[in-house]
């Protein structure tokens, strides 16, 4: 019988990743023995692997995060290639966030939301309350000045939030979470990128069949041709994968 409250780790190019078998494993791991874990969740895909390789500050930030997991299918395939016995699957960050919010609503876990446009954040709050009765104890859109950060950290601490989700894009959200944890360490932090936009319908995700086939990247490219430069950059990751330089 599998123990869902523990998980193996796998190393790709020096980065340690948690190996979750599926979404249920991820949730059981994060809520082991009914106690929500504390630390920082970071989704890892091929693009982020390249950024880690090229940017020492980002590498240090992400290495310090406790829970790094495979959000991209390319990363999952690389783990399976390097560790043939690995039982690891993709856990999409947007899906994990929704499942965490549903669980938080069920258990009354206090949540603080950071980031996004004001109108998107307001819609996110309303939908979370209506859909799962989430206990949102505070929020702040992404349009605040650097000199306001410390006061925001204090607000988060005073709120007693046990889950803090930050939608600011990488590496801004990782920097924010690192600094906020100095003031409010007793929480689970999650960087969620554009998840609020997807959740409220402002941005469309790839249909399920594209996700299942591992072609979400292609759907995004067809929807946003301007992403071509970002996609071409990923050829370097493919070279690592196919040459076994993992």
Swiss-Prot record:
Catalytic activity: UDP-N-acetyl-alpha-D-mannosaminouronate + N-acetyl-alpha-D-glucosaminyl-di-trans,octa-cis-undecaprenyl diphosphate = beta-D-ManNAcA-(1->4)-alpha-D-GlcNAc-di-trans,octa-cis-undecaprenyl diphosphate + UDP + H(+)
EC number(s) on file: 2.4.1.180
Transmembrane segments: none
Record GO terms (molecular function): lipopolysaccharide N-acetylmannosaminouronosyltransferase activity
Keywords: Glycosyltransferase, Transferase
Cited Pfam families: Glyco_tran_WecG
Pathway of action: Bacterial outer membrane biogenesis; enterobacterial common antigen biosynthesis
BP terms from Gene Ontology: enterobacterial common antigen biosynthetic process
NCBIfam families (alphabetical): PRK03692.1, wecG_tagA_cpsF
Primary role: Catalyzes the synthesis of Und-PP-GlcNAc-ManNAcA (Lipid II), the second lipid-linked intermediate involved in enterobacterial common antigen (ECA) synthesis.
Similarity comment: family membership: Belongs to the glycosyltransferase 26 family.
Protein name: UDP-N-acetyl-D-mannosaminuronic acid transferase
The organism's taxonomic lineage, starting at the top: Bacteria, Pseudomonadati, Pseudomonadota, Gammaproteobacteria, Enterobacterales
